[in-house]
């Protein structure tokens, strides 16, 4: 299906481009989201008549996103979660959690703007991209910790005591070697 893009779409094109996309992508994402119009003759004429208005609206949105991006770029958000001794979270931190932390800090960020490919499942400092506009993207740091004290220590760069996972195979070999050195085995008793 040929569509006319009403805004810049990543890996597809800029506003005003006529591109060919799969029918499902157009019907389920581009058309309902107001990102494109079907490329019919009537829509082409309508788009050309509205082009100046759409460009000014897009420029205003980009300027607003750039202003928010200047304040948001480099910010650190602390999220407190329960985690095991190895640093693995008992759940995960999703884009919604990061957006809620940003909103609590006074930033207007929607969860769809958080470009997290997979949920975060470990404690520590994590860089997360935030796409405020197709042309404006910034990075924020998410500090995931078990307590506020631990979050402060992580922010200062101190090492957090995380118990390393024990490899049971290596442990068995070490016990076997110790028994061999002692001249006995487990079956001697």
From Swiss-Prot:
NCBIfam families: L9 (TIGR00158). GO terms for molecular function: rRNA binding; structural constituent of ribosome. One of its GO terms (biological process) is translation. It comes from Beijerinckia indica subsp. indica (strain ATCC 9039 / DSM 1715 / NCIMB 8712). GO terms for cellular component: ribonucleoprotein complex; ribosome. Binds to the 23S rRNA. Belongs to the bacterial ribosomal protein bL9 family. The keyword Magnesium does not apply. Keywords: Ribonucleoprotein, Ribosomal protein, RNA-binding, rRNA-binding. Pfam families: Ribosomal_L9_C, Ribosomal_L9_N. This is Large ribosomal subunit protein bL9.
């Amino acid at each position: 299906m040929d569509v006319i893009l009403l805004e810049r779409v990543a890996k597809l094109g800029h506003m005003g481009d006529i591109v060919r996309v799969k029918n499902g992508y157009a019907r389920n994402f581009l058309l309902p989201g107001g990102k494109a119009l079907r490329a019919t003759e009537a829509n082409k004429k309508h788009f050309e008549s509205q082009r100046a208005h759409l460009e000014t609206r897009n420029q205003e949105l980009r300027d607003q996103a750039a202003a928010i991006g200047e304040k948001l770029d480099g910010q650190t958000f602390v999220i407190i979660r329960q985690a095991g001794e190895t640093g693995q979270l008992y759940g995960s931190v999703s884009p919604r959690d990061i957006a809620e932390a940003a909103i609590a800090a006074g930033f207007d960020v929607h969860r769809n703007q958080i470009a997290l490919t997979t949920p975060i499942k470990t404690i520590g400092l994590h860089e997360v991209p935030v796409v405020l506009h197709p042309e404006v993207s910034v990075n924020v740091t998410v500090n995931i910790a078990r307590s506020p004290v631990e979050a402060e220590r992580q922010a200062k760069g101190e090492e957090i005591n995380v118990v390393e996972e024990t490899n049971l195979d290596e442990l068995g070999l070490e016990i076997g070697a110790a028994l061999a050195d002692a001249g006995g085995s487990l079956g001697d008793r």
